[in-house]
A protein has these predicted regions:
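Anionic coordination/interaction segments
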Residues: 1-197
């Protein structure tokens, strides 16, 4: 999937710096819009980290169900709550489980001076001075993308949940280097709180 990923030092196409009508930078404004990605129309919520938490769900052609918090917590399964891939929780409980149910990614980045920095995208506390988040959902409604941009590290990490009849729930990930310089990284990526008895 091509998001117009900025490589070779080019600016990320959706990161703006202009001021809005009240003098706030665009990085401080929630900006919903339709965008075209790989020829497909998506609904984008730019700076979604500035919004109160909300929930969404991908459409399924079969009997899959999934509820995803804008903070990343997931409950999902097939048919009903008795057949979960991730344990079924009410939205009130799920709201407290962003760091313990769903995706987990740790990225160790080697700095030019040899030091290491560990970046955990989508952790509950976000440093708004260096990071911003966007959420995308395709018009068909069966794919949802979470994106975090780290300006300090010049990296973008995004992951996608999709639902299909053949493979069921599919999660894919991508990391993009926004700078012209090569970067050395190590990634630990996986899922937490799977209900293994039902897999």
């Amino acid at each position: 999937m091509i998001f117009g990923s900025a490589k070779n030092g080019k600016q990320h196409p959706w990161k703006r710096s202009a001021k809005d009508s009240v003098g706030r930078s665009a990085a401080e404004v929630v900006d919903p819009a339709y965008v075209l990605i790989d020829g497909e129309s998506w609904f984008q919520i730019e700076n979604s980290h500035l919004m109160p938490e909300f929930f969404t769900t991908p459409a399924s052609p079969d009997n899959h169900w999934m509820f995803i918090s804008s903070h990343g917590a997931v409950t999902a399964g097939r048919k009903d709550a008795e057949h979960p891939l991730f344990p079924y929780y009410s939205i009130y409980k799920l709201a407290d489980m962003a760091e313990s149910s769903g995706s987990l990614t740790l990225i160790r980045v080697q700095r030019p001076d040899g030091r290491f920095t560990v970046w955990r995208p989508f952790q509950k506390a976000i440093d708004r001075n260096t990071c911003s988040r966007n959420i995308y959902k395709n018009v068909d409604g069966n794919r949802i993308v979470f994106e975090e941009m780290n300006q300090e590290l010049s990296l973008v990490f995004r992951y996608q949940w999709s639902v299909g009849k053949q493979f069921g729930f599919v999660r894919t990930c991508e990391i993009v280097n926004l700078s012209a310089a090569p970067v050395t990284i190590s990634i630990l990526d996986g899922l937490q709180n799977l209900s293994l008895i039902h897999i």
